Structures are given as structure tokens and as C-alpha cells.
Amino acid sequence: MANSSSFSPSTTVTDLISTVHDDIIESHILTRLDGATLASVSCASSHLHHLASNEILWSKICRSTWPSCSGGSRSFFSDAYSMVETAGTVSDLDRPFPELISAVDLHYRGKLIFSRVVKTETTTAWFKSSPLRIDLVDTKDTVATPIKRRQRTEDTCRDLEKDLTLSWIVIDPIGKRAANISSHRPVSVQRNWISGEVEAQFATVVGAVECVITVVTCGEEEMHVREVSLKVEKMEGTHLNGRDSLVILRSVMEGKRVNGSRREVESKKRHEEFMEKKREMKEKKMRVESVFDILTVAFGILGFVLLVVFCLWRTSI
């Protein structure tokens, strides 16, 4: 009777990989993978996990994915690549948070056209009480781009919606956490009919608020970036101040994460749901105000009628 033996597929794969020299795997295989694939490979075996944990690999991936970040690591990639599913609870509100770092990269058709790192002081009274607005482009400056403006505004908007991508990573240097609050591609692109500029909005919804990034482009032939800004907006339409915005951003950094591969689809879906709720809330508010106005007019007329009746009664005595 012939001897038979069974092999576990995972064991067979591991044995085959172990026959390949580590230098070949590190230099010719792992260096060709993107961050998401490298993370998946590291889960295949303990040997690959050890090789894929090389800090140099993750630093190169972070620099190529986010040029605004001069260095990086595996944990940073995990924070910045993943998408927030639900916001976390900020338990230590009294922990020092002296500055918020924003690392921003704007691409058009895969080509980097804007990259900047900005530090925002968070301890001043002005920051805490004023509506949060982080501007990356000076009001007097513009950034030249290779984007050509089409003859029809609709075509220009369609091009930007398809080819413009943005990463806005907020970093807590004390807590050593980060999160990408951009939707990667615009959730909306439209022309400002007053100024004629084209505005692209990227957004991440966090509960009843939305982190809105606005990119404003101008120019008749070759377009320039005139504004790249961040605000945190409530469903009622008002903007949160710096103190409350900081709590929201920290809850995003500490929230539950999911794979960021569906960031564009999920972000746009959440944005549309947010805007629908916003419209419903606005309509409800208008209905309440309309009823209040009707009651005010009715009571006014009733008061006037009673006053006339009272005056007539007095004159008849």
C-alpha cells in the first residue's frame, strides 16, 4: 500500500519562501509593493512579518505616498492610510496639545502640484474661541499648476472631479497619532458663479459634523490654486471653533479604523447622507419659523381686533 501524506497550503508556501534568500526578498520583491500590499504580505508568515517590518521600507512608502512627510514608519502609514469608521472617545481632554500639524499633498493625474506642512498653535485664546480655519496658501499668492481650463465649465469640473486627489493628514505630535481627513477625491466640484472660480471640496463626516477641505482654482487658461483650507462644519451650517474642532480631530485620530481602499466611495456616500440630513434640518427649521410667523401675525391681528372692540365698547358707554 502506497504511503500518502498531506501538506498544509500555508506550510508549503512558507517552505517555498524560506528557500529564497532574504536579500532577494527585501531588495527585489518587498521594495516593489505598495503599503497596503506590504501589510498583507506581512501577515502571511512570521518570516515575512519580520522582513516586512523593516523601517526603511515603510519610510520609503510614506515618502512616496505623502511627499509632505519627510519620514515615516509602519504605524504612521497605518494611521494615515486607513479610514475612520467611527469616531473614538477622547478621555484625556486635559492632555497638552500645543500644536496641530497638517501635512498636505495635492496631485493632478498622479503628478504632485502642491505639498506643504503647517503647524497650528492650539493654546492661544484666539484659536480656541474663533471658528477654525487652516489656510495653506497666502491670500496674496497662487500656486501654478499644469491644469488646463476647458472651454465649458462643466468639462473643467468633471476633469477635476476625476483627476484631482488630495491627502490632508492631521498629526498629534504629543499623542503620536495621525489621521487622513480627506476623501482622496472631491465629493463635489462646482463653479462659484460670483467669482467665476472653480471650487473642489473634499470631506470626512464625523457624526453630526463634517471636516471640509476646500481647494479653489482660478485662471482663464492654465489654472492656479488660490486656496487650500480646512474648516469643521456642523449640520446646522455653523463652523466649530478651534477648541471644539480639536476635540473632533482627536476623536478621529483615536477612532475605529477600516481599510482605506474604499475611502472615495464611502466618503462621498457619507457626504451625500450628511447633506441630505442638512437639507431636512433646514426645511424643518423653515417650517417651524413659518408656523411661528403665522402665529405671530395671528396674535397681532387678534390683539388689534380686541383693541378696536374695546375702544368701540368704551365709546358706546
From Swiss-Prot:
A Pfam family this protein belongs to?
A: F-box-like
Listed InterPro entries: AT3G44326-like, F-box-like_dom_sf, F-box_dom
Record domain F-box: where: 25-74
Name under which the protein is recorded: Probable F-box protein At2g36090
Supply the source organism for this entry: Arabidopsis thaliana
